[in-house]
UniProtKB/Swiss-Prot annotation:
GO terms for molecular function: GTPase activator activity; phospholipid binding; zinc ion binding. The gene is csx2. A zinc finger (C4-type) spans 686-710. One of its GO terms (cellular component) is plasma membrane. Residues 657-666 have a biased composition (Basic and acidic residues). CDD domains: ArfGap (cd08204), BAR_ArfGAP_fungi (cd07608). SMART domains: ArfGap, PH. Residues 212-251, 647-672 are annotated as: Disordered. This is Protein csx2.
Length: 870
């Protein structure tokens, strides 16, 4: 195998051997010069244990070069032999210069050496020193080691890069570096995972010389075809700057043709660069539009999530809210990046250089025309010189100088645009954009990748929900088949059994029942006269010894008539009515006939009313007031269906009873504030700032009692964080009142302020400190200190199972999902109305299907109906 002949000073320096080593002084590759001819070198390569050696050919004219692996501590130990020349014995300032291409090496040795006064400080230059010969010496050998310290900044393209090492001496007379010898090899990355390439096949005549090690010669290449490069080899060359001839040709056909070609290329460059800038502006504008589109999409998701939280809110919380923020940042930053790093730099190059080509061309042509006109005049003069001719000759010389300068400037300008300095400026702009664009994309992908655990968690939640809904679907199908196969006769036979079952049920609960009944619009109507159209549907509620009828129950509850007091009433099946399933309620003031939807329902209503009548008599005997509003406030958790529905009716539909409701509210609210402060001493002061002034507000979803200043801060956080109510002006559900009774400020602060060590933090110097404290306490929850070891969702279910209200508040503070496994339904099934109310106030969904509704108690059904009614 042969290589390239070095025709310059080949006899001055000869590389006798090169040893590739590592940090532990292990020789990985040995290279020996086996040529005995002084005209060229022939190298033999060998490894320990006769391991194969890889070669790669980058350029056909260079021949194959050896491949080595880049590693920390890679060294090349050279054995160099210098020969004295006649008239030039010593070697002055022997220098080793390395590069990644012959062009780069040539530029370093010639142009950069001439222009850089600190050339010796270049990281690619190594000064070895002077080599001095004694008087009787004609040759001298030295050893010098080159290390790979500078390779840490080397750019490896496709896993490797060529290295060219050139030994040169300094010529004082010419003030330049004179190359003596060049050695090249190919470095691959140490972590490159690729199949080793087959050693480059050697020519036959070299294989005959040595059968154990391949040899590469610097002699001219022999005839014969060269095999293609090994698979996975890097490209032939790395991108390098275009070599430009700095000497312009004389003005003539060649110069004009070159200029004409440059002008055409520049014109095309002007057109395509202008279109490119417009396309980039369009892309930047598109990123702005995309930013607005994502904003609108996020707003749409948020609106629909407020309407249907179970379907959309988990998607927003676990993925899209954070992802949309990342998308917004990416689009804004990408638009800014395109504008600052592409559009503005390219437009500056276009406006200051490429756009002015016609002006520069016009100036050059005018100067050229003026010069050749002056030349014609100058040549038309006779050879006899006069004083005036000398003046004209000096003017002509000035014209010629101006023309040559103009020609030089125009030619240099055209060279800069066509692959020269301006082309390098464009490449620099694109490279800067590429680096920043990569960093931006990488950062955005990192942000998106961080959402992967949340997405996996969301998938697990959906999987569990799907399993639960499959069970619910099976229950619904079973219920539907039961409804299809059941008959009216069967229901009539089982009516008595159903009535007895309900009687046992009401013995355990309060005397409460609600349902759909038919009745006349007026209790005084004659049943024998009024036809079918006289019967109307009413939602009837039996609660605490009273029967309330509500009309228009499909849209909103409206109290139809005055409640019927059952203290002196009696109930019985209606005998004088031709319609079935009728019963009548008789009091000293009125007689009211109702029709149930089945015989079982009729018996159920009769049993419930009879039980309520007996209970009213007992309570009357004890002297206990049956006013439902007073019972709710004074005795805590005794609220039931009637008050709940009556409260909703008074709020949602104006009627003649509104004035009574207002009066009750005005008499009740002050007593609520007083009762809370009497029950809990901590409620006498604000839960956040400890002031005792105007403590008349509360955050019902935590729940805590607040002053007017702190309540304003709470209100600014939004209703999704805290729900503020006035203890003196607003009206509360009985369960909310019970929840306030059962907790108190100290109860809640043990959880939300358990981590405060320095209580000076609550001494607010200004409003900003107060606002920050409220946000830290309720929004960021930075003061919670808990040794709770369970998952908050699991802990929430356990608190419901054991009726542990404090643990439920703690789990919600730790981020438990209020809709986890239908926690509200589980609380209602346990008759735990305090935790159910706590969950509802914190946003729990009350979408209870019909099958589940039937399993709830009457009070639990009222709880759901009260909050599900629009």
């Amino acid at each position: 195998m042969t290589g390239h002949v070095d025709p310059v000073h080949f006899e001055r320096l000869k590389i006798q051997s090169v040893t590739f080593g590592s940090a532990n002084d292990n020789a990985s590759l040995q290279v020996h010069n086996v040529s005995k001819s002084p005209e060229y070198s022939k190298y033999s390569y060998s490894r320990k244990n006769n391991e194969p050696i890889e070669f790669i050919q980058l350029r056909e004219e260079e021949g194959p070069i050896v491949k080595v692996e880049e590693e920390d501590g890679l060294t090349l130990r050279f054995q160099l032999e210098f020969h004295a020349q006649e008239g030039k014995r010593d070697v002055t300032n022997l220098t080793c210069v390395y590069g990644t291409s012959p062009q780069q090496l040539d530029r370093l040795i010639t142009r950069e050496f001439s222009s850089d006064a600190n050339f010796q400080n270049n990281h690619q230059v190594f000064l070895i020193g002077n080599i001095e010969f004694h008087s009787n010496e004609n040759s001298k050998k030295i050893e010098w080691t080159w290390s790979n310290q500078s390779l840490h900044t080397l750019y490896f393209r496709n896993g490797g890069s060529p290295i060219y090492l050139c030994f040169a001496e300094y010529d004082k007379r010419l003030n330049c570096l004179v190359p003596l010898k060049t050695f090249q090899f190919y470095v691959t990355e140490s972590d490159q995972d690729s199949t080793p390439a087959t050693p480059f096949p050697m020519p036959m005549h070299l294989a005959e010389e040595t059968a154990t090690s391949p040899e590469i010669s610097d002699a001219p290449p022999l005839s014969g075809n060269v095999d293609p490069l090994p698979i996975n080899s890097p490209p032939l060359t790395n991108p390098v700057a275009r070599d430009i001839d700095q000497t312009e040709p004389e003005d003539g056909p060649l110069f004009r043709a070159t200029i004409l070609n440059y002008e055409r290329t520049t014109h095309d460059m002007r057109m395509v660069l202008k279109k490119l800038i417009k396309r980039i502006e369009h892309v930047a504008h598109s990123h702005g539009l995309l930013y607005m589109s994502y904003k609108e999409l996020m707003s749409a998701f948020e609106r629909v999530a407020t309407i249907n939280p179970p379907a959309f809110k988990p998607f927003l919380d676990h993925y899209y809210a954070a992802a949309a923020q990342s998308f917004d940042s990416f689009n804004i930053d990408r638009a800014r990046l395109l504008r600052n790093f592409l559009i503005e730099p390219l437009r500056k190059i276009y406006d200051t250089d490429i756009k002015n080509v016609s002006t520069k061309k016009k100036d050059f042509e005018e100067t050229s025309r003026d010069y050749y006109t002056s030349l014609s005049r100058y040549l038309s003069k006779s050879e006899k010189e006069t004083s005036s001719d000398k003046t004209k000759e000096s003017k002509f010389a000035a014209k010629k100088r101006d023309f040559e300068l103009s020609r030089f400037d125009y030619y240099s300008y055209m060279q800069d645009i066509n692959g020269g300095r301006k082309g390098q400026e464009v490449l620099s702009v694109l490279t800067s954009f590429a680096a920043n664009d990569y960093n931006l994309i990488h950062s955005s992908l990192t942000d998106i990748d961080a959402l992967r655990p949340s997405i996996i968690q969301l998938q697990d939640i959906v999987t569990e929900a799907n399993k639960e809904f499959q069970l619910l679907r099976a229950e619904r199908e079973e219920r539907r088949r039961y409804i299809e196969t059941s008959s009216r006769e069967l229901e009539d036979k089982d009516a008595e059994i159903a009535a007895q079952a309900y009687k046992a049920k009401v013995d355990q609960d309060t005397s409460a029942k609600q349902g759909l009944l038919l009745a006349f619009s007026k209790s005084t109507s004659d049943l024998q006269v009024v036809g079918k159209s006289g019967w109307h549907k009413y939602w009837v509620v039996l609660d605490h010894g009273k029967i309330c009828e509500y009309a228009n129950w499909k849209q909103s509850l409206e109290l139809h008539t005055e409640p019927i007091d059952l203290l002196m009433a009696t109930v019985r099946p209606a005998q004088s009515v031709s319609r079935k399933f009728c019963f009548e309620v008789i009091t000293p003031q009125t007689k009211r006939t109702y029709q149930a939807t089945s015989k079982a329902e009729m018996h159920s209503w009769i049993e419930a009313i009879q039980y309520s009548i007996s209970e009213s008599i007992v309570q009357k005997g004890k002297g206990t007031s049956m006013n439902s509003e007073e019972t709710s406030v004074k005795h805590g958790p005794t609220s039931t269906i009637g008050k709940a529905l009556q409260r909703v009716a008074s709020v949602t539909s104006p009627s003649r009873h509104n004035s009574d409701s207002k009066e009750k509210k005005q008499t009740k609210s002050p007593s609520l504030v007083k009762t809370l402060k009497e029950m809990h001493s901590s409620d006498q002061s604000c839960a956040d700032c400890n002031t005792t002034a105007r403590v008349e507000w509360c955050a019902i979803n935590f729940p805590v009692v607040l002053c007017i200043d702190c309540s304003g801060i709470h209100r600014s956080l939004g209703t999704h964080i805290t729900k503020i109510r006035s203890l003196t002006l607003d009206k509360f559900n009985p369960e909310t009142v019970d929840l306030l009774y059962a907790t108190g400020n100290s109860f809640v602060n043990e959880i939300y302020e358990g981590g405060i060590t320095d209580w000076k933090i609550k001494n607010f110097e200004n409003q900003e400190r107060r606002v920050q404290f409220v946000k830290d306490k309720y929004l960021y929850k930075r003061f919670i200190k808990s040794s709770f070891s369970h998952d908050p969702n699991t802990g929430l279910l356990e608190s419901i199972e054991h009726s542990n209200l404090k643990e439920a508040v703690l789990c919600l503070a730790l981020g438990a999902d209020v809709n986890y496994q239908r926690a509200v339904v589980k609380a209602l099934l346990k008759n735990n109305y305090l935790i159910a109310e706590l969950l509802t106030l914190n946003g729990a969904s009350l979408n209870v299907d019909e099958v589940t509704m039937e399993t709830l108690s009457a009070r639990a059904q009222a709880f759901v109906m009260n909050r599900a009614t629009p």
